[in-house]
UniProtKB/Swiss-Prot annotation:
GO terms for biological process: iron-sulfur cluster assembly. Transmembrane segments: none annotated. The lineage of its organism: Bacteria, Pseudomonadati, Pseudomonadota, Alphaproteobacteria, Rickettsiales. Chaperone involved in the maturation of iron-sulfur cluster-containing proteins. Has a low intrinsic ATPase activity which is markedly stimulated by HscB. This is Chaperone protein HscA homolog.
C-alpha cells in the first residue's frame, strides 16, 4: 500500500534540508509551481517575477522560450488527442495548423527543427518550471504532484505523465484539478460536505461536484465546456470596444479589453484615452456567457443526483468578476468560497498533497490508498475497473452485472489488478463462479458484486443473485508478492500503452455491440418472417452486411457508424410492426417480451 500523510502544523521552512516535492498546475493559459512546508504554501515566481507563467512555447535562435505569449499556445488541449481528432476539430486544428505534420501517421508537430510529439514539447514547459523552482530553492527537484482536468482520459493523463518524466520529474501523483482546489480548502478550513467546484480558466470551463469527508475527496460528477473561458470574455469586450469606439480588431485592443475587465473587478468604471466602459455595461456584455456556465453547473448537479451543496469553490482568475459570484449565489443560494486566490487554489492543493506524500513525521495521520486499480473481466476480455488506483481505503464499492447469453446458469468472475484496459495485460488475482442460476434470457439475471478493501489492504469480493438467492465470496491480498518496483513498472506500462489500450477497448466494445445486434436481428428475422416483406428483409440484411464488413475490418469508428446507420435507416425505411420489434430489440428487450 502507498501512504498519504497529513502533518501537524509547524513553522514553515522552505529551505530546510529535507526531501522536497512540488505541486504543479499545468494550465491551458497559465502554469504555476509551488512548494508547501508545514501546510504553508509558497508559489514560486519566474525569473521575471511572475507567479502565473503563460503556457506558451516558442523556438527562436536554437532555444526554447517559455511564457512570452508567442509561439504554440494551449498545448494542454492536445494531450491525449490523435491526429484524426485534431484534423476533425476546427478549434484544435487552428492551434497547431502552423506546426502540424499532416504526412505523419500519428500526431507530430514540426517544432525546433524536428518532428516532436506533444509530450516532448510539453516537457520543455515542465523543464522551465523545474529550473525556475530549483533556482529559487537552491536545490534539485525530482518529485512532483501534477494536476489534470477531471475529465482527462487515460491517454491524456499518460501524456502528462510522460512529459513530466522527460523533464526529470518523478510524478508522485496526478490529481484532478477540482480535487486539488477542494484539498486546499479542506485542509486549511477543515471543510467537509458536498461542494461544487466552479473553474473558469482562460481557455476552458470545468465544473465538478465533490464529496469531502474526513480528508477524503471524491469527484461524483463532472461537466464543462473546453471552448469557453476567460478568453471568451476578453473577446466579447474587444468586440464592444471595436464597435463602440471604432478601434481595430488587434492585439492592442484585446490587451485593452483585458485591462478593462481586470479594472472593473474592483472599480465601477474604466477610462483610457478616448475609451470608457462601466461595470454595468460589462455585466450586460458577459451575462450570456456567465449564464452558460451556470446552466452547465446545474446540469452537473443533476448528473450527481441533485445532492445538497454546502458551498461553491471558485477556481480561475475570471471568477474574480463580481457578476459571477452574484449569479452563482442567485442560482444556488449557498456560500461562495473565494478567499484563496482563485488563480492559485489548484496549485496550493497540489503543493499540500506533495508535502503530505513525502514528508515523514511522528505526528501524522496515515491514510492508505490502493496502489493499483482493482476490477474484473467482462465479456470480450475488457476490464471493468471497480476500485481505482490511489483510492483511499478502507472502501466498499457495489456494481451490478448481468448475463450475456440466453440460459446461462453460471457467471464466472475473474478478479484483476492493474491499469490496462484488457484482462490479458493485467495481473490475475482470483477466479470464482456463481453457479445454480435459473436459465433465463440474456439480461434478466442481475448479479450484485461488492468489492471491499479493509484497513489492512485485504480485498473481499462477493457476488449475490437475488432470484436464485445464490451468493459466493472470496478474500485475497492484492499486494501480496508484489513490490513497489513491480507496481511502478505496471503503472509505467499503463501510461506508455494508454493510447493503444484505449483504442483496443473501444474496438472490442464496438465488436461486442455489433455481434449482439447481428445475433438479435437475425434471430428476429428467422422467427418473425410473417411480419415483414422480402424487400424489408433485403434492406435489413444489407445493413447487417455493412456492420459485418466493419467488424471484419476491425475499425471501431466504422463499426459504430454502421450501427448508427442501421438504426437510422430502419426507422426511415421500414414502417411495419417488424420495425417496432426491431426497435424494441435495440432497446434491450427480447423476442419473448415483444410477442
Amino acid at each position: 500500500m502507498q501512504i498519504i500523510e497529513i502533518r501537524e502544523p509547524e513553522q514553515a521552512d522552505f529551505k530546510q534540508e529535507r526531501q522536497i516535492a512540488v505541486g504543479i498546475d499545468f494550465g491551458t493559459t497559465n502554469s504555476l509551481i509551488a512548494i508547501a512546508a508545514n501546510r504553508q504554501v509558497k508559489v514560486i515566481k519566474s525569473i521575471d517575477d511572475k507567479e502565473l507563467i503563460p503556457t506558451t512555447i516558442d523556438f527562436t535562435s536554437n532555444n526554447f522560450t517559455i511564457g512570452n505569449n508567442k509561439g504554440l499556445r494551449s498545448i494542454k488541449r492536445l494531450f491525449g488527442k490523435t491526429l484524426k481528432e485534431i484534423l476533425n476539430t476546427p478549434a484544435l486544428f487552428s492551434l497547431v495548423k502552423d506546426y502540424l505534420d499532416v504526412n505523419s501517421s500519428e500526431l507530430k508537430l514540426n517544432f525546433a527543427n524536428k518532428q516532436l510529439r506533444v509530450p516532448e514539447i510539453a516537457a520543455e514547459i515542465f523543464i522551465y518550471l523545474k529550473n525556475q523552482a530549483e533556482e529559487q530553492l537552491k536545490t534539485n527537484l525530482t518529485k512532483a504532484v501534477i494536476t489534470v482536468p477531471a475529465h482527462f482520459n487515460d491517454a491524456a493523463r499518460g501524456e502528462v505523465m510522460l512529459a513530466a518524466k522527460i523533464a526529470g520529474f518523478e510524478v508522485l501523483r496526478l490529481i484532478a484539478e477540482p480535487t486539488a482546489a477542494a484539498y486546499a480548502y479542506g485542509l486549511n478550513k477543515n471543510q467537509k460536505g458536498c461542494y461544487l467546484v466552479y473553474d473558469l480558466g482562460g481557455g476552458t470551463f470545468d465544473v465538478s461536484i465533490l464529496n469531502i469527508q474526513e480528508g477524503i475527496f471524491q469527484v461524483i460528477a463532472t461537466n464543462g465546456d473546453n471552448m469557453l473561458g476567460g478568453n471568451d470574455i476578453d473577446v466579447v469586450i474587444t468586440q464592444y470596444l471595436c464597435n463602440k469606439f471604432d478601434l481595430p480588431n488587434s492585439i492592442d485592443t484585446l490587451q485593452l479589453a483585458k485591462k478593462a475587465k481586470e479594472t472593473l473587478t474592483y472599480k465601477d468604471s474604466f477610462n483610457n484615452d478616448n475609451v470608457s466602459i462601466n461595470k454595468q455595461t460589462l455585466e450586460q456584455l458577459i451575462l450570456p456567457l456567465v449564464e452558460r456556465t451556470i446552466n452547465i453547473a446545474q446540469e452537473c448537479l443533476e448528473q450527481a443526483g441533485n445532492p445538497n451543496i454546502d458551498g461553491v469553490i471558485l477556481v480561475g482568475g475570471a471568477t474574480r468578476i463580481p457578476l459571477i459570484k452574484d449569479e452563482l449565489y442567485k442560482a444556488f443560494k449557498i456560500d461562495i468560497l473565494s478567499d484563496i486566490d482563485p488563480d492559485k487554489a489548484v496549485v496550493w492543493g497540489a503543493a499540500l498533497q506533495a508535502e503530505n506524500l513525502i514528508a515523514p513525521h511522528t505526528n501524522s495521520l496515515l491514510i492508505d490508498v490502493a496502489p493499483l486499480s482493482l476490477g474484473m473481466e467482462l465479456y470480450g476480455g475488457i476490464v471493468e475497473k471497480i476500485i481505482m488506483h490511489n483510492t483511499p481505503i478502507p472502501i466498499s464499492v457495489v456494481k451490478e452485472f448481468t448475463t450475456y447469453v440466453d440460459n446461462q446458469t453460471g457467471i464466472q468472475f475473474h478478479i484483476l489488478q492493474g491499469e490496462r484496459e484488457m484482462a490479458a495485460d493485467c495481473r490475475s488475482l482470483a477466479r470464482f463462479e456463481l453457479k445454480g442460476l435459473p436459465p433465463m434470457k440474456a439480461g434478466y439475471i442481475r448479479a450484485e458484486v461488492t468489492f471491499s478493501i479493509d484497513a489492512d489492504g485485504i480485498l473481499s469480493v462477493s457476488a449475490y443473485e437475488k432470484i436464485s438467492n445464490t451468493s459466493h465470496a472470496i478474500e485475497v491480498k492484492p499486494n501480496h508478492g508484489i513490490d513497489k518496483t513491480e507496481i511502478d513498472i505496471m503503472l509505467e506500462n499503463a501510461y506508455k500503452n494508454a493510447k493503444i489500450d484505449y483504442t483496443t477497448r473501444l474496438l472490442q466494445e464496438a465488436v461486442i455491440e455489433a455481434e449482439a445486434l447481428i445475433f438479435s436481428i437475425e434471430r428476429a428475422i428467422a422467427e418473425l418472417t410473417t411480419l415483414s416483406s422480402e424487400s424489408e428483409i433485403s434492406i435489413i440484411n444489407s445493413l447487417l452486411d455493412n456492420i459485418k464488413e466493419a467488424v471484419h475490418a476491425r475499425d471501431w469508428i466504422l463499426i459504430n457508424n454502421s450501427i448508427k446507420e442501421f438504426k437510422s435507416k430502419i426507422k426511415k425505411s421500414i414502417d411495419t410492426k417488424f420495425n417496432i420489434i426491431i426497435n424494441d430489440l435495440l432497446k434491450g428487450k427480447n423476442i419473448n417480451q415483444i410477442k
